[in-house]
């Protein structure tokens, strides 16, 4: 019994201020001790200005019932960031076989969480297959609608979305300048 319990334990890399792996811990220990770790954040959008928003189930170990402006999750021990993003998108929403754009990394910290986030995006129109134990529902919202309801969202996903929007605006500005 003990061996089976250990085999099902989810292990995560614990990182320092420079995002260097310094240890591994169980996901449960990481949450209980608010250890610094890595996570992926995937902005799923329709390519026409709407963002796919998910409601977290009430059974989630972190911020249950809140809205997420991004898909994603904790990176497992020794897992590559893009591999983690693809795994999370497929597990949570059934998204597979679509290109992912990488938008760099960022750091987020508050009283509940210390995380190095890897930011990705993808375009998808569904249909979506929700992971019942993690996602209770999804809907499409504009960035303005998300901002108007920001108190309903996980703070780390709002930071990821703001960073994506800022980096997207810079890319669009460069493309416009190049086209002129």
Curated annotation (Swiss-Prot):
Keyword terms: Hydrolase, Magnesium, Metal-binding
Cofactor(s) of this protein: Mg(2+)
Gene3D superfamilies, sorted: Nucleoside Triphosphate Pyrophosphohydrolase
UniProt protein name: Uncharacterized Nudix hydrolase YfcD
Organism: Escherichia coli (strain K12)
InterPro entries: NUDIX_hydrolase-like_dom_sf, NUDIX_hydrolase_dom, NUDIX_hydrolase_YfcD_pred
Nudix hydrolase domain mapped to chain residues: 35-163
Entry EC no(s): 3.6.-.-
Gene designation per UniProt: yfcD
GO molecular function: hydrolase activity, acting on acid anhydrides, in phosphorus-containing anhydrides; metal ion binding
């Amino acid at each position: 019994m003990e061996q089976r319990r250990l085999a099902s334990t989810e292990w995560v890399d614990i990182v320092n201020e420079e995002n260097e792996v310094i240890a591994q811990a169980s996901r449960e220990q990481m949450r209980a001790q608010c250890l610094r770790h890595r996570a992926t954040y995937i902005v799923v959008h329709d390519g026409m200005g709407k963002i796919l928003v998910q409601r977290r189930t009430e059974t989630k170990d972190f911020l249950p019932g809140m809205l997420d402006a991004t898909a994603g999750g904790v990176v497992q021990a020794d897992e590559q960031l893009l591999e983690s993003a693809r795994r999370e998108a497929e597990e949570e929403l059934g998204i597979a076989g679509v290109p992912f754009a990488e938008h760099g990394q960022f750091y987020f910290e508050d009283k509940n969480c210390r995380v190095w986030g890897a930011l990705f995006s993808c375009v998808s129109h569904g249909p979506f297959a929700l992971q019942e134990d993690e996602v209770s529902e999804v809907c499409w919202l504009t960035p303005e609608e998300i901002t108007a309801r920001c108190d309903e969202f996980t703070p780390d996903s709002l930071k990821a979305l703001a960073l994506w929007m800022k980096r997207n605006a810079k890319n669009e500005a460069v493309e416009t300048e190049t086209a002129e």
